[in-house]
Amino acid sequence: MSRIWDISQPLHAAVPVWPGEPAFSLHSHAVIGEGCPVNVGGMFTPLHAGTHGDAPLHYSNDGASSADCELAPYIGPCALIDVRHARGRVEIGDIDWSCVDGAERVLLRTYEQFPHEKWDSDFTAVAADVIERFGAMGVRLIGTDAASLDPEQSKTLDAHQAVKAADMRILEGLVLDDVPPGRYELIALPLRIVGADASPVRAILREIA
């Protein structure tokens, strides 16, 4: 049986969120006890907390919401590339481009160890010309273990705009610590949330036999 890696962050009250956003929360409406046979709960989550997929609506007012995103980019063969040596931003020279050949999905590992316990303002972003080159090579989806493709304080979102121009899709907040670089099958479907600019995903990688 093929090995499966869960590359999703666990969602809980202390999961790091973007500065100024409310925390993830889980609450109970009912608990098993006398007169109640079931546990029933609800949750609140910022759409960009944890492992998530940005919908085009996030960076374009006329972009598709999570409910309207084509699912095909989120399923299929991918290349996982180690770019932990990049500093501040992944640049053209940080990537072994032979690893990208033929890949429609590319995941970038930037962290030595994923910061599960606290928000990291100094995460490694991705240069717009890297996105452009991915697009020219036929890449349909880019994923990263960082919180965003663009720096935290960016107002121009150059990488996101390059994604828009190439009609690519985005996964952010992946946990890639335990997965060796190489080729895998990716499955990371967004929820069908009408009007949402992003969605949580349960992202997995499956070993290709």
UniProtKB/Swiss-Prot annotation:
Known EC number: 3.5.1.9
Keyword Zinc on entry: yes
Cofactor annotation remark: Binds 2 zinc ions per subunit.
Binding site for Zn(2+) 1: H48, H52, D54, E172
GO biological process: anthranilate metabolic process; L-tryptophan catabolic process to kynurenine
Record-linked Pfam families: Cyclase
Keywords: Hydrolase, Metal-binding, Tryptophan catabolism, Zinc
Cofactor(s) needed: Zn(2+)
Binding site for Zn(2+) 2: D54, H160, E172
Self-association and partners: Homodimer.
NCBIfam families: trp_arylform
Task performed by this protein: Catalyzes the hydrolysis of N-formyl-L-kynurenine to L-kynurenine, the second step in the kynurenine pathway of tryptophan degradation.
Full protein name: Kynurenine formamidase
Native species: Sphingopyxis alaskensis (strain DSM 13593 / LMG 18877 / RB2256) (Sphingomonas alaskensis)
Gene behind this protein: kynB
